[in-house]
Amino acid sequence: MAMPDPLTEVDRAISEIRRGAVVRVYDEHNSLLMLAVDALSADYLRLLTQSGTKMPKLVMTGTRVNLLGIDKSDRPVSVLSHPEGISLDLIEYLANPLAASMMPPSMASLEVKDADVLEQSCVTLAKLARLLPAALIVEANATADIPAVQASSIRSYMTIAAHSLTQVSEARVPLENAENARVLAFRPRDGGIEHLAIIVGDLNPAEPVLVRLHSECFTGDLVGSLRCDCGNQLRGAIGEMATAGSGILLYMAQEGRGIGLVNKLRAYQLQDAGFDTVDANLQLGFDSDERNYLPAAQILRLIGVNRVKLMTNNPAKVTALGNCGIEVVERVPHIYPSNQHNDAYLKVKAKKSGHLF
C-alpha cells in the first residue's frame, strides 16, 4: 500500500479542522483525535468525547499558558486537563484572549504537563490552518473512522511545500510606478496558497539583485489602513526598484506576520484594548513572528537569484534568508514617515523586534 502524500493528508486535515470537524493525528506509537478550539461546536465536541477513550484535554502554546499565569515554565506547548473534564466556558477562556471580559471560570484542579511530540503536532496543525493555536485532544479508539494525518507530515509540511513550489503562470503587468513589470505566480505541489513575484525591469543575475520580501497585508496594501506602513512599503519598493533599473518584490502569503487575516484582526482588537503589536500576537498564543522564509528563498532560486540586496528594516529577515541559502550582500533601509495611527506600532517594532529606523 502506497504511503500517503504528506502535503495531501495535511491539506485534508486542515480543511477538516477549519470546518470544525475532528481529525486523527497519529505516529508509530499513539493516536489522538483532535478538534480545533477555534471552530468548536457542541456536535463535534460530543463526537470527540464519544470517539475517544478518556476525557478530552486542551493543548495550547506555552506562551498563552504563561500569560494566563497558570504555569511559568518554558514549555513550548502545554497540555491542560481536569479530573472532571474541561468545560466549554473554561476552554474558551483559556484559548481565546478576547473572551477575557468573561468572569474567569474556576481553574481549581487544573493540571498542566509538557506536550509530547504528537500533542505538539496538533497545535502546529491549528497554526497551519490559520486558526487559534489550541486544540482539544483525546486518545483515539483503534476503530475510529475519522480522517487521519501523520504527525511527521505536519512537522515537515512547511519544508516540503516550499521545496515543491513551481511557477504556474506569468504575465506582463504595467504598474503605476514601474511600467516594465511582470508578475509570476508560484504554487506548491498540493495546490496550496500561491506566492507571487513582481519582477521590475530586466534582471542581471550576475549581480546582486535588489529584493523586497513583502508579506501580504489586506488592510495596508489594499484598503489603505493607517495602522501599519505596509502599503507605503509595497508601493515604495516597486518605485525604488524602477528607479534602480530592476528588482524583485516577493509578495508572500503570510498575512499578519504569518498568523492569517482573521487572527490579525483579532490582534488589532487586542491592540485597541491596550496591547502592542507584539504582545497582541503573544496573547493569542502565537510567537511574535510566525513567518517561514524558506518559500521566499526557493522562489528566488527558481528565478535564478542567489545573491541579493535586501530591502528591509528587519535584521531578522537578513539572517533568516541567509539561513535558507540566499546570500544577502547588503541591507537596504526601507523607511517611510509614521502617522498618528502607526507611530506607536513602529516604535514597538524597533524596541521589541529589533527593526532599524
Where are these regions (language model features)?
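Catalytic domains of riboflavin
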Residues: 1-357
